Amino acid sequence: MIQWFLKYRPRSLKDVENQDDAKKQLQEWIESWLNGNSNVKAVLLHGPPGVGKTVLAEALAHDYNFELLEMNASDSRKLQDIKSIAEKAAVYGSIFGTKGKLILLDEVDGINVREDTGAIQGILELIEKTKYPIIMTANDPWNPGLRELRNKAKMIELSKLGKYPLRRILKKICQAEKIICDDEALNYIIDSSEGDARYAINILQGIGEGYGKVTLNLVESLAKRKERELDPFETLRDIFWARYAWQAKNAATSAQIDYDMLIRWISENIPIQYDNIEDIWRAFDALSRASIFLKRAKSGDWDLLSYAYDMMSSGVAFAEPEKKKPNWKPKWKKYQFPSYIQLLSKSKDIRDTRDEIIKKLAIHSSFNKALNDTYPFFLLFYKKYDKHLNLNTKEKEYLSSISKS
């Protein structure tokens, strides 16, 4: 089952709704690039989720016969991943007989500038050296970590999708799928989606495929209004408590954490949610399949991302056969953070405490010299000299734990 927002996404710029100004700016930029007159090598498309940023880039590639070289920047974050894109663009010729290539770096605001060391610098180097136009997308372009990218790129804003354009999109899909949708139900979906076309189409598909029609009563009882900030605990509850596959999938695709982290959250809490060992096994089996699809999607076949979401959401949600019974009721459980996050947090806290001690030791030397030369010996004799360093309670506890180990 293919998702409708993928099945009916615009193929050409002329089919993209409500973004006339953005389309005009993008076409002017690509025309100047093709004519050799552009001083700007990259564009940063920005706007709320579901307004068509990625679709606009794909449609541009289609209309200008470019081979699209696509990478989700928030998933392939390391410097080496960025460089591999540059090498492919620079070295390998197109096998599709196209004019050239268009590089798409999706979700650059998903890059963690602290953890993903070198990723931003890698993109800057790619922009500097590229022989092909680059399009980046972001929900939040004003992230402080993206300042250098903003300076290098032409900023093009996509507006929130209006009610009338969204209505046209949904009406076309209803006609194509032969789904009867009441006007009141359509209005409710449009209001609930807050201009997010993907979210609105997911609701339409979930109810339309499940019931063959979309009425106000069905929408009001089954569809949640769009929430921009979904707590991970709320996302888990929506997945585990879902009565329908589309509800579980909506929860997963609306999560404010990336797919990898969502899998960690689900994995940690499967044994908490399910009591029956067979239910637990089925849930982990679905989650392992999600990981396989996700790995293949990241290698370039992004259509498989939909199947990854199916497995990590409805696959996990319906691991419990009891849910199919009409008298089934959800069980409230106290979910917990992934131990992976707790370990990272604890590890960082320990390193920070250690570094504070080393800074106190490095009064007359560099930090690295104190770390490599002074610190190892200090650990052997710290009890004699700790008073001279004005160590706080946390630092003393750290040293005490080191000596015991």
From Swiss-Prot:
<dbReference type="Pfam" id="PF21960">
    <property type="entry name" value="RCF1-5-like_lid"/>
</dbReference>
<keyword id="KW-0235">DNA replication</keyword>
<dbReference type="GO" id="GO:0003689">
    <property type="term" value="F:DNA clamp loader activity"/>
</dbReference>
<keyword id="KW-0547">Nucleotide-binding</keyword>
<dbReference type="InterPro" id="IPR027417">
    <property type="entry name" value="P-loop_NTPase"/>
</dbReference>
<dbReference type="GO" id="GO:0005524">
    <property type="term" value="F:ATP binding"/>
</dbReference>
<dbReference type="InterPro" id="IPR047854">
    <property type="entry name" value="RFC_lid"/>
</dbReference>
<dbReference type="InterPro" id="IPR003593">
    <property type="entry name" value="AAA+_ATPase"/>
</dbReference>
<dbReference type="InterPro" id="IPR023935">
    <property type="entry name" value="Rep_factor-C_lsu"/>
</dbReference>
<comment type="subunit">
    <text>Heteropentamer composed of four small subunits (RfcS) and one large subunit (RfcL). Probably interacts with PCNA subunit PCNA3.</text>
</comment>
<comment type="similarity">
    <text>Belongs to the activator 1 small subunits family. RfcL subfamily.</text>
</comment>
<dbReference type="GO" id="GO:0006260">
    <property type="term" value="P:DNA replication"/>
</dbReference>
<keyword id="KW-0067">ATP-binding</keyword>
<dbReference type="Pfam" id="PF00004">
    <property type="entry name" value="AAA"/>
</dbReference>
<dbReference type="InterPro" id="IPR003959">
    <property type="entry name" value="ATPase_AAA_core"/>
</dbReference>
<dbReference type="GO" id="GO:0016887">
    <property type="term" value="F:ATP hydrolysis activity"/>
</dbReference>
<feature type="binding site">
    <location>
        <begin position="47"/>
        <end position="54"/>
    </location>
    <ligand>
        <name>ATP</name>
    </ligand>
</feature>
<protein>
    <recommendedName>
        <fullName>Replication factor C large subunit</fullName>
    </recommendedName>
</protein>
<comment type="function">
    <text>Part of the RFC clamp loader complex which loads the PCNA sliding clamp onto DNA. The complex possesses DNA-dependent ATPase activity.</text>
</comment>
